[in-house]
Amino acid sequence: MNTLDFVDQASLREDVPDFRPGDTINVHVKVIEGSKERIQVFKGVVLRRSGGGVSATFTVRKESYGVGVERTFPVHSPNIDHIEILTRGAVRRAKLYYLRELRGKKAKIKEKR
């Protein structure tokens, strides 16, 4: 095993659920404000997953007061407390960038049965 692979293996998280683009998830993020630490929940639809290993990332999109907000998280980040899957989406694409232009009911994703 390569030394770099050994270091990467140590920083991988085991508690990451199996989620895909189209799923609606809650990402519980640790936020540090001054000396206090709290957990902030970011709820949205997974637009994409990219990369592999330690450098894997995913992007979540939500609408907040009529404005679209996208946030990209590293999958194995220590700043993520945990991820919970709310609904599974039935989509046929790996990257859901087309959701950026859609509004209202058209932006809804069918739930996988």
Curated annotation (Swiss-Prot):
Q: Which Gene3D superfamilies match?
A: 2.30.30.790
Instruction: Report keywords, A-Z.
Output: Ribonucleoprotein, Ribosomal protein
One record GO biological process: translation
**One GO cellular component term noted in the UniProt record for this chain:** cytosolic large ribosomal subunit
In the record, what terms sit under GO molecular function? structural constituent of ribosome
Family that this chain belongs to: Belongs to the bacterial ribosomal protein bL19 family.
Relate the protein's function as given in its record: This protein is located at the 30S-50S ribosomal subunit interface and may play a role in the structure and function of the aminoacyl-tRNA binding site.
Q: PANTHER family this protein is in?
A: LARGE RIBOSOMAL SUBUNIT PROTEIN BL19M (PTHR15680:SF9), RIBOSOMAL PROTEIN L19 (PTHR15680)
Q: What is this protein called?
A: Large ribosomal subunit protein bL19
Protein species of origin:
Mycobacteroides abscessus (strain ATCC 19977 / DSM 44196 / CCUG 20993 / CIP 104536 / JCM 13569 / NCTC 13031 / TMC 1543 / L948)
